[in-house]
């Protein structure tokens, strides 16, 4: 897998017996708006979305990160790549961006 999140999952599940994967946890930095009160979201501009707190990326992926759109795509990817049910895929906000994803096993 090309995404760091999915690559981490792939590495975690190597050697697991069939059926041992209980849950996939994808992490998200939270993007540029993670500390913004919900009522302020109506006022944000594209320039605000481009101020990612952790990463220097291209414009599209930075906006996708700020809106968490990229996490929606990553959930779909994890579902198809690893055969996980959508209810077994979680997103956790992890502002430090140290862990890219985790798995829970039985």
Curated annotation (Swiss-Prot):
The lineage of its organism: Eukaryota, Viridiplantae, Streptophyta, Embryophyta, Tracheophyta. GO terms for biological process: isopentenyl diphosphate biosynthetic process, methylerythritol 4-phosphate pathway involved in terpenoid biosynthetic process. This is 1-deoxy-D-xylulose 5-phosphate reductoisomerase. Pathway: Isoprenoid biosynthesis; isopentenyl diphosphate biosynthesis via DXP pathway; isopentenyl diphosphate from 1-deoxy-D-xylulose 5-phosphate: step 1/6. InterPro entries: DXP_reductoisomerase (IPR003821), DXP_reductoisomerase_C (IPR013644). Mn(2+) binds at residues 3, 5, 74. GO terms for molecular function: 1-deoxy-D-xylulose-5-phosphate reductoisomerase activity; isomerase activity; manganese ion binding; NADPH binding. Enzyme of the plastid non-mevalonate pathway for isoprenoid biosynthesis that catalyzes the NADPH-dependent rearrangement and reduction of 1-deoxy-D-xylulose-5-phosphate (DXP) to 2-C-methyl-D-erythritol 4-phosphate (MEP). Required for chloroplast development. Coiled coil: none annotated. The keyword Isomerase applies. PANTHER family: 1-DEOXY-D-XYLULOSE 5-PHOSPHATE REDUCTOISOMERASE, 1-DEOXY-D-XYLULOSE 5-PHOSPHATE REDUCTOISOMERASE, CHLOROPLASTIC. It comes from Origanum vulgare (Wild marjoram). Belongs to the DXR family. It catalyses: 2-C-methyl-D-erythritol 4-phosphate + NADP(+) = 1-deoxy-D-xylulose 5-phosphate + NADPH + H(+). One of its GO terms (cellular component) is chloroplast stroma. Keywords: Chloroplast, Isomerase, Metal-binding, Oxidoreductase, Plastid. 1-deoxy-D-xylulose 5-phosphate binds at residues 4-5, 29, 52, 65, 70-71, 74. The gene is DXR. Its EC number is 1.1.1.267.
